[in-house]
């Protein structure tokens, strides 16, 4: 079950990286882990907790999520007019100067001013973020219509308009959701339903399908809004050998109605605008609107889907859920939040910045909700129609009668449910994790929680009758600490305890992204300050303390000593002046305005220097480590890493300076040095890391905004347009060298490792220079690189995006080649690549050397059936869909496998039966000089027995979790002898 208590911390952000492994499911050599992770930054009022409770996330598969920029990329109306970037990306071609940029925006803007023919379009690609199975990144559509990926890996995006989109009729007929009473259908007639991503090992990951696609629509003004596909869950994994893992989802409740949720919050705003006299600073012929009360609510109606079944060649995983019985109640509060769900048109005529919100829009998409009766009755029906699901159990069943195992969850009864325990059981044994949280609660009613300027709880509830100050709301440590994870108790009885403190900073990035401002304060949530590990008897094992400064002695000083850099100070007011200085709009918001930046992973606060001190059980220091990171400020190599200004601008004067930038967040948060000090403060070791950019061109990203302001005094309507073109960097910032220096009483010893990379972001070379000053290097060539000249299997590998297999490794000492190891590849009849031979040479021209491994035949999965290794001929018998070797015979006559190829290939594609083992025994008798190993497996494909060439058999017993319980054998008289027994004792 792993090592308990060793909780890593992402010290650049101060966030503990907490993960509880559940189990792994497999398909051949592919492993899909299932676990629960906890993220401290997600302890906030919005949105509602996930299926594992507040701040916990179920890690099982993955997803692609979309940030819509302007129109959804695929937006198309029932008359066939496409609004989105998907069919207008070519409008960006030819933008090579500011004048051509302004011209492109002006042409586009004209379609907004005269939309009688519905000719509007946009120049902004949506942003698609993916996170699955250890892979993460983003992708965008570029001006050529290609999907461009921003990731540390070379990941390929596949999308087909015919296979990955549906129209409104198909969406309705599928039963995925009900569009009852929706009046904006004609403007929404195309929806993206999925993508396929291919990783460098050739694995294909399919996302979406209607059951695995989540949708959303603004909760208010639903009548005139777009229905948007926002999330595509992982639905199938296909390995390069053709094995599949399928993931199924549920989107309907027990009443066979589409599951609905809402994410509502109170976010009042105000707007004042009019014609501006720059001589005296006055406004005229304008208007003022304050959106408080009912008009201050914002949010979305959500159409979620939940992972229900995972099927592999070996296991079936079933996830069961139950509705949170108190969810509806937390959406209702008399006189306040209750009005966030519904109000009647006769009660209030609501409009927000000129958009009329009819009362009957509240029933759109609400199949099964009766609109008759009192307002209170209708609100209660709407609340009851919402469902917030929580995970109850995850059960894994073996496909081969190996039994079952499950994880059972327990939750608190607080307003925002907390995961309190995980029980692991297989019907015979069980063990538990338990979790405790800091005391106190956020507001019970979801829409009414008050937040600071970073979205964290202040501990109060909003008062909707008040006019906000629209100013910075500071963070409160007491409020932020409430409901945070304080303790994990492991199955052994040991514990890990967490203490937190507010994030601090001594510098902040300017809004223009050109420089840093000396300014200190607290901001943006919590960081871990201390982690205490306790033994089962409660005594302290060790303590880890974290200091976010340059020296431990600085930790007790003022905020100015903090190494934190604030990415931006939240801005609550925008003063927007037209370029001719004749029109002014002043917009204020309780929630801070966000800067539209693509490919941005900047934390609220990042730390340039963090010290981690370890304290032993006796309270004495065991030493500490100081880690430095690249950040906005200057790193140890004199290099700063700020964002950069837009390439082109067409903007109004914005005194708040909120403007898009080109993000360089991919350069920040890289560890630049680690210094290890002993208990007395002496430096024992120092490791320095340098980085460089990989190849890859930036893609242009346009941000534009069109604003229409209705004025008075006969002045008509003011039209304002703003836009910027920034760059989205595809290149990455990889480690190019590591210099490690160890200090001992006899002197210092240094080793330097240098690295280069391919265009595919795979390693190109690694060079190590030791204390003897000699370079020892390895240079790598990959099979896909041989495709243009060698064709055949290499072309197939390149086409399937199988990039990682090596074709050659050349080892050098200085400039002299020491040896070269090569691999050749072929493909099966079904197109599965496999290693067909390996050779070792003493020169780079491949003239001096020999082939030392050759595959003579394979099964359909590319597993070798007959190989020659250093003149030794071996036969290999595979089974269980090519996942397990059930027999190996060494020193057999050449061609033996070919004589039995039909049986061997058939055996590989199915599970073995007793007659298969009988055939192996007969084969062993036919070749008395051969050395046979025979393997049996249990229902979980764990080893059951191993028979070695002398006929001795060792037996193994595992539990359903794959833990070895016993090793034993039988003697010639049939007596059973135990070799080893293993007991797993847990405290509870």
Feature locations, PLM:
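Short, solvent-exposed beta-strand-terminating loops
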Residues: 252-259, 324, 440-448, 886-900, ...
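Extracellular structured ligand-interaction cores
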Residues: 15-19, 31, 124-127, 136, ...
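Long, intrinsically disordered, low-complexity, charged/polar and glycine-rich segments
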Residues: 1-233, 239-242, 264-271, 276-301, ...
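Short, flexible helix-coil linker/hinge segments at the edges of structured domains or between repeats
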Residues: 253-286, 324-336
């Amino acid at each position: 079950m792993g090592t308990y208590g060793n909780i890593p911390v992402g010290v650049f952000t101060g966030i503990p990286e907490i993960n509880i492994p559940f189990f792994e499911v497999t398909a051949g050599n592919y492993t899909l882990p299932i676990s629960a992770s906890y993220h401290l930054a997600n302890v906030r009022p919005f949105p509602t907790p996930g299926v594992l409770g507040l701040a916990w996330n179920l890690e099982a598969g993955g997803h692609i999520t979309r940030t819509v920029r302007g129109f959804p990329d695929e937006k198309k109306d029932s008359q066939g007019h496409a609004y989105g970037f998907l069919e207008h990306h070519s409008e960006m071609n030819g933008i090579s100067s500011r004048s051509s940029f302004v011209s492109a925006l002006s042409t586009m803007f004209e379609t907004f001013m005269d939309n009688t023919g519905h000719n509007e379009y946009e120049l902004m690609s949506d942003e698609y973020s993916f996170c699955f199975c250890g892979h993460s990144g983003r992708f965008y559509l570029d001006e050529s219509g290609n999907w461009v990926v921003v990731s540390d890996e070379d990941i390929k995006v596949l999308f087909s308009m015919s296979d990955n989109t549906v129209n409104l009729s198909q969406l309705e007929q599928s039963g995925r959701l009900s569009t009852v009473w929706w009046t904006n259908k004609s403007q929404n007639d195309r929806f993206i339903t999925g993508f396929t991503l291919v990783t460098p090992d050739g694995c294909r990951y399919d996302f979406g399908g209607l059951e695995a696609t989540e949708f959303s629509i603004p909760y208010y003004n639903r009548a005139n809004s777009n229905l948007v596909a926002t999330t595509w869950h992982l639905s199938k994994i296909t390995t390069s050998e053709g094995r599949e893992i399928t993931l199924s989802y549920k989107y309907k409740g027990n009443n066979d109605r589409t599951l609905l949720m809402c994410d509502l919050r109170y976010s009042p705003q105000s707007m004042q605008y009019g014609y501006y006299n720059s001589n005296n600073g006055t406004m005229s012929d304008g208007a003022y609107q304050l959106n408080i009360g009912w008009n201050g609510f914002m949010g979305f109606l959500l159409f979620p889907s939940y992972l229900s079944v995972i099927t592999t060649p070996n296991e079936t995983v079933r996830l069961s859920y139950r509705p949170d019985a108190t969810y509806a109640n937390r959406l209702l509060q008399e006189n306040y939040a209750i009005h966030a769900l519904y109000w009647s048109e006769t009660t209030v005529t609501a409009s927000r910045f000129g958009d009329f919100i009819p009362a009957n829009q509240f029933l759109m998409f609400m199949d099964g909700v009766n609109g008759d009766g009192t307002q209170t009755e209708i609100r209660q029906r709407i609340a009851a129609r919402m469902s917030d699901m929580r995970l109850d159990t995850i059960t894994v069943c073996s496909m081969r009668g190996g039994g079952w195992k499950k994880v059972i969850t327990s939750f608190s009864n607080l307003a925002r449910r907390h995961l309190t325990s995980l029980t692991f059981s297989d019907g015979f044994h069980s063990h538990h994790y338990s979790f405790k949280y800091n005391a106190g609660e956020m507001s019970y009613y979801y829409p009414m929680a008050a937040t600071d300027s970073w979205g964290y709880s202040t501990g109060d509830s909003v008062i909707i009758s008040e006019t906000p100050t629209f100013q910075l709301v500071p963070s409160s440590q007491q409020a932020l600490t409430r409901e945070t994870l304080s303790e994990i108790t492991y199955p052994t009885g040991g514990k890990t305890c967490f203490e937190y403190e507010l994030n601090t900073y001594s510098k902040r990035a300017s809004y223009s992204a050109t420089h840093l401002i000396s300014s200190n304060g607290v901001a943006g949530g919590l960081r871990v300050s201390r982690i205490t590990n306790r033994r089962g008897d409660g005594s302290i094992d060790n303590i880890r303390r974290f200091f976010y400064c340059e020296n431990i002695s600085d930790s007790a000083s003022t905020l100015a000593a903090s190494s934190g850099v604030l990415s931006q100070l939240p801005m609550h007011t925008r003063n927007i002046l037209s370029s001719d200085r004749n029109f002014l709009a002043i917009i204020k918001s309780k929630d801070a305005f966000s800067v539209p930046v693509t490919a941005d992973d900047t934390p609220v606060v990042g730390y340039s220097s963090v010290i981690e001190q370890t304290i032993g059980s006796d309270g004495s220091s065991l030493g500490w480590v100081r880690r430095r990171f690249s950040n906005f400020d200057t790193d140890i190599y004199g290099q700063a890493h700020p964002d950069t200004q837009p390439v082109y601008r067409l903007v109004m004067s914005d005194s708040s300076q909120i403007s898009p930038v080109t993000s360089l967040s991919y350069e920040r948060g890289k560890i630049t040095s680690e210094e290890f000090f002993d208990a007395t403060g002496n430096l024992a070791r120092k490791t320095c890391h340098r980085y460089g950019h990989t190849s890859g061109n930036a893609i242009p990203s346009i941000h534009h905004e069109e604003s229409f302001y209705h004025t008075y005094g006969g002045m008509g309507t003011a039209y304002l347009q703003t836009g910027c073109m920034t760059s989205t960097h595809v290149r990455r910032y990889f480690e190019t060298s590591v210099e490690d220096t160890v200090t001992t009483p006899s002197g210092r010893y240094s080793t330097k490792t240098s690295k280069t990379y391919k265009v595919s972001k795979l390693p190109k070379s690694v060079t190590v220079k030791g204390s003897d000053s000699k370079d020892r290097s390895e240079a790598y060539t990959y099979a896909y690189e041989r495709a243009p000249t060698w064709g055949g299997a290499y072309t197939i590998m390149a086409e399937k995006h199988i990039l990682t297999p090596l074709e050659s490794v050349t080892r050098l000492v200085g400039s002299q080649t020491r040896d070269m190891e090569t691999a050749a590849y072929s493909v099966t009849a079904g197109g599965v690549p496999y290693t067909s031979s390996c050779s070792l040479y003493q020169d780079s021209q491949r003239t001096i050397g020999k082939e030392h491994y050759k595959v003579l035949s394979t099964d359909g999965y590319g597993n070798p059936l007959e190989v020659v290794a250093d003149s030794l001929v071996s036969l290999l018998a595979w089974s269980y869909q090519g996942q397990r070797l059930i027999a190996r015979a060494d020193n057999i006559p050449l061609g033996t496998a070919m004589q039995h190829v039909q049986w061997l290939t058939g055996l590989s594609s199915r599970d073995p039966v007793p007659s298969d083992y009988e055939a192996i025994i007969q084969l062993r008798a036919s070749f008395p000089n051969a050395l046979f190993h025979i393997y049996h497996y249990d229902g979980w494909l764990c080893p059951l027995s191993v028979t070695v060439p002398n006929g001795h058999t060792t037996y193994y017993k595992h539990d359903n979790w794959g833990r070895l319980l016993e090793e034993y054998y039988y003697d010639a008289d049939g007596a059973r002898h135990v070799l080893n027994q293993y007991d797993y004792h847990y405290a509870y």
